[in-house]
């Protein structure tokens, strides 16, 4: 453990370095730390010996090491902090007409990326926790049809498919009936399980040839098992990391898995400093924050950036955007669930 004065010195060096990205000397610290320059230098040397500070090659000043940033995050950073100066700018950025859920999630991701200069990722509610609350099949022609699904009574998912060659109209009706009887109102996790267990047995009762029917089930419902991911500022990753991080961000499903793994069960927020199990994120910092999507569950708002980021402001922005987004979503879902009257 370090002393209170050493902790104050480390915190101040982190604050000054993230603002200027210049090594910090004892004279700069003396303006805030009420100790002699010699005492401060001695404490800085001890912090360096502990691996929390690093000596700059071009000056006598010190800068935080990755371990120093991590210590600061774990012992001094408040994950619920908010800087009131950013509230107005975030609210103003959200002043737009949203026509669907995806509009708001994409906008929030862009706002966070633009205000930080880093990479932002937003995830919808985890697929396994969503429920299938509506299903229909619309025949578009003699050869293709559209499966129209509703998740959580509000999120539409459509899948266009070619009607199998041996299908008759009654076969499409049977397909829909099986879904309504066996899968409707179940969670996506239940659907995944039933497609491997119950459905193959049920299909045998309705169809002579079952192979293409089971393939159709897999094709139509595979969309439900995918994460809905919104990435903004991907090219920014090239300024604080290497090409592997940039390429990793192209694999949105793997990005979603890694971000969810970084948040422990029951946690609402976390900050990982060069601590991700994913190799492409091992040398960056990842801030993750859960936000409420009314009536449906929690989404995930993440910021990926350099180890030497301004953590206080980044955490503040993540918190503000999460709160404003949740409020915006609350208005959106209240509107969807209310009676709508045309105004003349």
Swiss-Prot record:
Keywords: Repressor, Stress response, Transcription, Transcription regulation. InterPro entries: GAF-like_dom_sf (IPR029016), HrcA (IPR002571), HrcA_C (IPR021153), WH-like_DNA-bd_sf (IPR036388), WH_DNA-bd_sf (IPR036390), WHTH_HrcA_DNA-bd (IPR005104), WHTH_transcript_rep_HrcA_IDD (IPR023120). The keyword Transcription regulation applies. One of its GO terms (molecular function) is DNA binding. Signal peptide: none annotated. Belongs to the HrcA family. This is Heat-inducible transcription repressor HrcA. It comes from Streptococcus agalactiae serotype III (strain NEM316).
């Amino acid at each position: 453990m370090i002393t209170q004065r050493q902790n104050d010195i480390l915190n101040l060096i982190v604050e000054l370095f993230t603002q200027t990205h210049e090594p910090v000397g004892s004279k700069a610290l003396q303006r805030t730390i009420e100790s002699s320059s010699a005492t401060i230098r001695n404490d800085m040397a001890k912090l360096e010996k502990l691996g929390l500070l690093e000596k700059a090659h071009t000056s006598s000043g010190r800068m935080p090491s990755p371990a120093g940033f991590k210590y600061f995050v774990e012992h001094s950073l408040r994950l619920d902090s908010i800087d009131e100066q950013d509230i107005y700018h975030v609210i103003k950025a959200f002043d737009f007409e949203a026509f669907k859920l995806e509009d708001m999630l994409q906008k929030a991701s862009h706002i966070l990326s633009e205000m930080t200069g880093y990479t932002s990722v937003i995830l919808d509610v985890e697929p396994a926790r969503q429920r299938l609350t509506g299903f229909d099949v619309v025949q578009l022609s003699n050869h293709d049809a559209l499966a129209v699904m509703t998740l959580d009574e509000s999120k539409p998912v459509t899948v266009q498919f070619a009607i199998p060659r041996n299908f008759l109209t009654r076969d499409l009706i049977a397909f829909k009936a099986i879904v309504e009887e066996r899968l409707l109102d179940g969670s996506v996790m239940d659907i995944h399980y039933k497609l491997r267990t119950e459905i193959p047995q049920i299909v045998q009762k309705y169809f002579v040839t079952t192979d293409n029917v089971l393939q159709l089930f897999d094709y139509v419902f595979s969309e439900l098992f995918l994460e809905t991911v919104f990435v903004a500022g991907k090219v920014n990753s090239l300024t604080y990391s290497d090409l592997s991080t940039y390429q990793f961000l192209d694999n949105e499903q793997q990005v979603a898995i890694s971000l969810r793994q970084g948040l422990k069960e029951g946690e609402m927020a976390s900050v990982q400093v060069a601590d991700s199990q994913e190799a492409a994120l091992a040398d960056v910092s990842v801030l993750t924050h859960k936000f409420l999507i009314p009536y449906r569950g929690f989404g995930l708002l993440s910021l990926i950036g350099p180890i030497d980021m301004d953590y206080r402001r980044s955490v503040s922005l993540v918190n503000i955007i999460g709160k404003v987004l949740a409020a915006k979503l609350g208005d959106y879902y209240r509107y969807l669930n209310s009676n709508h009257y045309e105004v003349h």
